[in-house]
Amino acid sequence: MPQRAPHCRRATGSIYVLCLSALALAGCVASPPAPSAAVPVVAVPTAWAAPAAAAASAVTAAAPVDLTSWWRSFEDPELDALVARSLGAAPDLEACAARVRAVRAMAQASNASLGPQLSLVGLPQQSPDGRDNYFQSGIAAQWNVPLSQRQAALKGLAEAELQIALADEQAARATLVAEVARTYFEMRAAERDQQLLKQMAALSDERARITRVLWQTRQVSAAEVESAAAIGVQVRAAAAQPAAEAAQARLRLAVLLGDLQAALPAPADSAAPPVRVALGLSALPADLVRQRAGVRRAEQSVFKAAHATGLARADAQPQISLLGFVGLNFLVSGPASSSLRGVFSAGPAFSMPLFDGGQREANQSARHAEFDVATALYRKEVMQAVAEAQAALLQLDLERQRMAAAVAVEGTALRLADSTDAQARAGLADGLQRTEARRAALQASRDSLRSALAEQVAYVDLFTAFGGAALPAAAP
């Protein structure tokens, strides 16, 4: 078996000494332990505190709404189509998707930096005595040995950044769907209000005609004729408001769809109120931690801060690298006898921080403080999420009570109008009484329409508060 030359044994021994020295110095560095990547436990109620049976039924309905597609529960094909189009073309979602791609690419770059690197290099060299000048060219290899703590911190940071980007995408998706639904409901309510005001304008014209006839027979004064005409003008002027609201809602829908020339549903030609659907939720307060994009983002911010603290701690450890080079030396000038010779070198290298005036310790303290900030904000986000969901339930309860009252008033007004019509046909009521009863019924229908819109918006707010439009489980 061939024996190693003495200088080779000495070189090998020197390498071992260097490596052992680096590891020994690493053990001497005092660093506070990095916090564990775990979110704090936040106490939340085990059930919702909705006082009325209406709100309670919204939580315990037999057929709960699927939060990933809650808008379908309204059974409105036009709304379903608008939501689908917005999810496919909205600029906000395009921006979020691009950010997710960027974060994924950065994560791949971070993972790639942990592996060996090969480079084609060329640089001038000079002999130790300064007499010969060479140009050295070849392939350089370098591998920064990833110590376990640094490797785990870098991978954890990349994963947390990706999850934060996905949470932002989920939040944008939920906001977009909520805005599309809310705007669509407002548009339809304004269009139905227009139809009701058209009927009220026709009644005002009839009332003005009847008043003029009565004035001609000296049964009413001229002031009453003027008042009836003024009421008609006011009703027609009032119709401009829902017309403008409908036009504005259509413009907002076009923006949400990402196309100002987008084809939108035809205007409603009927004053019929929207169909009320019995919607329910089975989510409990603890479910918000898994569903709300804001809670998910806060959770990943805690993980990110924990891994950043671990990386700051790893910065105080030695950095060990394996280096290698193979190439050629070209003689540029000098008395050397050989103008071309091969070069090969390989071995370890390390860098160990010894003194930096307290910079590393201050950096670690800062990262620990940022971790404390992230955990505090996580607790706040969880409590705020539960509070917003509870407030949305209470608001829905209120709007459902108002809607029930409005429907009852509308029913009474319609029955009174029908009764007055029958009395007028029998000669027991005059035309003014009939038009006034019908006007009161139309006004009650307008009030009911506004209550229906408020109830629909309350449902939208409730689904949004529960993390509605969350990404399906199969999505990346």
In which residue ranges do the predicted regions lie?
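Transmembrane beta-barrel domains of outer membrane proteins
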Residues: 111, 140-144, 236, 310-313, ...
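Small/polar (Gly/Ser/Thr/Ala-rich) solvent-exposed segments
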Residues: 114-134, 142-173, 186, 191-193, ...
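Periplasmic alpha-helical coiled-coil/stalk elements that build and connect Gram-negative outer-membrane
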Residues: 151, 160, 167-284, 395, ...
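Terminal intrinsically disordered/low-complexity segments used for targeting and assembly
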Residues: 2-4, 12-88, 243-290, 332, ...
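Membrane-embedded beta-strand positions in outer-membrane beta-barrel channels/transporters
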Residues: 83, 138-140, 184, 285, ...
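A short glycine-centered flexible hinge/capping loop motif at secondary-structure junctions
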Residues: 215-219, 424-428, 465-469
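Transmembrane beta-barrel architecture of outer-membrane proteins
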Residues: 79-81, 123, 134-136, 182, ...
